[in-house]
Amino acid sequence: MKKIMMIGYGAMAREVLSRLPDGVSVGWILARAAHHAAIDSAFGGQVQALTHPDQCTEQPDLVLECASQQAVAEFGEAVVTRGWPLAVISTGALADAALQQRLQQACRQHQGQLIVLSGAVAGMDGLASAREGGLDSVTYQACKSPASWRGSMAEQLIDLDAVSEAQVFFEGSAREAARLFPANANVAATIALNGLGMDATRVRLLVDPATRRNTHRLQVCGNFGEFQIELSGNPLASNPKTSTLAALSAVQACRRLVDGGFIA
């Protein structure tokens, strides 16, 4: 039986926990103290609720972050300096170049592992392969409903209540998108990490009142040729900012743990 530590206890974390494959159990959940009573109740005291990785006296087989960019920044180094493998869904945290460098250095020094999950997008294996031959351009476009953009910087850039058709409200780099939209733009960061990097990856964000799905379009050109991917995914019912596929990518990470581990 493989035992994981979960960072987070929000909508995505709970979705992942409800879908853990056979052979994987959760031993620890790192979350704010306000969630600890709910964790104890949900798991009958069989799962240890933590506020910091230091409180874990055993070694998890995998630490799975399903919380936020802030959680990656706050706890990531503490995890990898213990030599624990850390899988992150909030990849936008790595738009902070200093944080990314610290995490990579800690992994080298302490035999840790930083695993970038694919999240809500497909084709990252092909993108990373294409990078080996040289990339000319990588462009990512995300289109979501007004509900998916509420509570984000989008509210300062466009009137979400008045929009009547699909409209672009942001164009810029993946680094800018990850910084301005920390709960919405992890896909942009994931694409950047597998492709041209945070500054050269171009991002366009749209709102469409007619859609109920999160649509991701990726266009890649390079010496290999070119490819385009379009993925129209359902958001989590419990959190419209989060794509169901992102949660499933975390579940699949757990399955890989059982089936023979990760290829980094």
UniProtKB/Swiss-Prot annotation:
Pfam families: Asp_DH_C (PF01958), NAD_binding_3 (PF03447). Its EC number is 1.4.1.21. It is an enzyme of class 1 (oxidoreductase). NAD(+) binds at residues 120, 186. The active site is at 216. Specifically catalyzes the NAD or NADP-dependent dehydrogenation of L-aspartate to iminoaspartate. This is L-aspartate dehydrogenase. It comes from Serratia proteamaculans (strain 568).
